[in-house]
Amino acid sequence: MWQAISRLLSEQLGEGEIELRNELPGGEVHAAWHLRYAGHDFFVKCDERELLPGFTAEADQLELLSRSKTVTVPKVWAVGADRDYSFLVMDYLPPRPLDAHSAFILGQQIARLHQWSDQPQFGLDFDNSLSTTPQPNTWQRRWSTFFAEQRIGWQLELAAEKGIAFGNIDAIVEHIQQRLASHQPQPSLLHGDLWSGNCALGPDGPYIFDPACYWGDRECDLAMLPLHTEQPPQIYDGYQSVSPLPADFLERQPVYQLYTLLNRARLFGGQHLVIAQQSLDRLLAA
């Protein structure tokens, strides 16, 4: 794998050699390395060869976010595979937690991301993943249909495959669709998994990574913030300073949070199952 990475980097940086190769802690999904090649520092994700499509999708999402010129993301240098492993090579940006100032700036940047481009439908040109969960993105013109079927219904079906039952799937999907039936927002490009673990302060300001992008309701990104108390509230303030949210945003917030809560429940079980069921019960009773 390292020979393949060196070859791809040499095509862009000229001949060099690997000067540093340190495995990083916390690689819960993929192995992660800090690599120095020809004086440049890189962050390398690697896994089994069969997982190359996931790395390709991540690279495509980072490129899409970069193309908006609104947010900072790690530059992708290489994505590929050898006989045994697949890999994704990006800029290495030593992460620090966001402070109040950088959180405010990030909030402004996210607001501008949501204003970028003019997309008439909801979805994405390819499917991707939320953490390790496959995420479908088939294009759909009605937001209520997209979110009810491809977000909530999808999570409920995946949970059922693991023997986790939250109720009648068809009835829940219908309820969610009705809750959103009168809400048809302008599609915005979303990061899709905007929590504190995917935001950091780098050498040149805040940056985001590990996206789960799709074109959706901008409120979905903002609905994530209250689920993570460690996320500085100034992100929300910065966002509001550029693109104020509608007054009825809080009515839809628990609907959008349910997607993340169901995903956690299926992945981690335990108390997450209780939290997701309680959230769903409150929505169905409203």
UniProtKB/Swiss-Prot annotation:
MF GO annotations: ATP binding; kinase activity
Xref: Pfam families: Fructosamin_kin (PF03881)
Main enzyme class: transferase
Binding-site residues for ATP, renumbered to this chain: D91, Y92, L93
Domain of life: Bacteria
InterPro entries in alphabetical order: Fructo-/Ketosamine-3-kinase, Kinase-like_dom_sf
Family named by the database record: Belongs to the fructosamine kinase family.
Protein name: Probable ketoamine kinase YniA
Provenance organism: Escherichia coli O157:H7
Organism phylogeny: Bacteria, Pseudomonadati, Pseudomonadota, Gammaproteobacteria, Enterobacterales
